[in-house]
A protein has these predicted regions:
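Bacterial N-terminal signal peptides that target proteins for export
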Residues: 1-11
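N-terminal acidic, proline/glycine-rich, low-complexity intrinsically disordered segments
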Residues: 2, 26-28
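Residues at structural and domain junctions
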Residues: 12-13, 99
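C-terminal segment of classical bacterial N-terminal signal peptides
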Residues: 16-25
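Primary mode marks residue(s) on the alpha4-beta5-alpha5 output face of response regulator receiver
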Residues: 28-203
């Protein structure tokens, strides 16, 4: 499936799932965890990981204001994703053009992640890099999963509850420390309790 069709499927699925993904069901979706635990990293890998965690907030600081992200093409998809035991992923604001581009650039994440706050606002908690598997595999020079500064992406295979083709994804919890690791999919201290579907609207 071409990247444009992937983005279209993303948008269609969002219309179906928006506002209802704060249920437990999505916690059962299985990702392949390829990222190396911090304790097992080499000195070079630790240095790369630290650099990535610094680059993300430097590159996304303007998105602390969600309206800036919206003006730059990011839009809420799938409501607020959470689960009972696995924590939450929060609200994913996706840039369809960046998804279609298929370029992995630490300074230009395809997704920025927010957590709803009690006062009705949104707190920026991280970024997510995403590339469709078919788009990645279409390049004959790609002989392994995508990697960003020493961090291998996780595979979200198809079929899945989103109705999307398989994709690779890498979460970076650069704005809210994750006790389970900066690059895991779920954050135990992110909550969707304050989620309101109106978060998709401009503030």
């Amino acid at each position: 499936m071409k990247a444009g069709k992937f983005a279209m499927h993303f948008a269609i699925a969002a219309l179906v799932f928006a506002g209802v993904c704060s249920s437990n069901a999505l916690a059962q979706d299985v990702h392949s965890h390829n990222s190396m635990p911090q304790g097992e990293m080499t000195a070079q890998q630790k240095s790369q990981a630290s650099a990535l965690i610094k680059i993300v907030p430097q590159s996304t600081v303007r998105f602390q204001d969600v309206t800036v992200a919206q003006h730059e093409g990011y839009a809420l998809q799938f409501g607020c994703v959470s689960g009972d035991s696995a924590g939450a992923m929060g609200l994913h604001y996706v840039n369809g053009d960046l998804v279609k581009g298929g370029v992995i650039d630490a300074t230009r994440p395809q997704i920025v992640i927010y957590e709803p706050t009690p006062n009705g606002g949104l707190r920026l908690v991280g970024a997510d890099y995403l590339v469709p598997v078919e788009l990645w595999n279409a390049d004959p020079t790609h002989t392994s999963p995508p990697e960003l500064m020493g961090q291998l992406f996780h595979l979200f295979d198809a079929p899945n509850r989103f109705g999307l083709p398989a994709f690779y994804t890498l979460h970076v919890w650069a704005w809210k420390d994750n006790p389970n690791g900066a690059f895991v999919n779920w954050h135990p201290n992110v909550s969707c309790e304050e989620f309101n579907p109106r978060h998709s609207e401009s503030k």
